[in-house]
Amino acid sequence: MLKIAIVEDERECQEALIEHLRKYEKEKNEAFIVRIFNDGIDILDDYSADYDLIFLDIHMKYQDGMTTAKRIREVDANAQIVFITALAQYAIEGYKVNALDFILKPVVYEQLTTMQDRQCTMYFTRSQTARA
């Protein structure tokens, strides 16, 4: 079961992501555990390398997404990070922390499914390799 963190300070974007993930679960017969964090400092408060996928907003009130991603990478090289941003220019910065992808706001279901298909394939490939 894929563990997903959503780190986003805008409630509308949180709700859109959850709605899209639930729709994806039904369409693809997948199951996710999703946890919401309202800011970068919230996920780092008690971070453990449990997440397979982290949706991370770039602009947040207390700690921006890029700083949060750098701190996550210090303790977790495996979590896939997908940045959520209104500005495509931040995508280049994401490569410095080995981000999987970025999604432009407002989040569109088709954009999420393309990225999620790739993530699920990577996750199941890693899981099967670990079992072998």
Question: Could you describe each region identified by the protein language model?
Answer:
Residues 1-3:
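Non-catalytic signal-transmission and effector/linker regions of two-component phosphorelay proteins
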Residues 7-8, 37, 54:
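Conserved sequence signature across two-component system core domains
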Residues 10-35:
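Two-component/phosphorelay signaling modules centered on CheY-like receiver
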Residues 27-30, 125-129:
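Charged, solvent-exposed alpha-helical segments that act as regulatory interaction surfaces
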Residues 36-42, 65:
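Helix N-cap/capping motif at the beta->alpha junctions
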Residues 45, 51-127:
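CheY-like receiver
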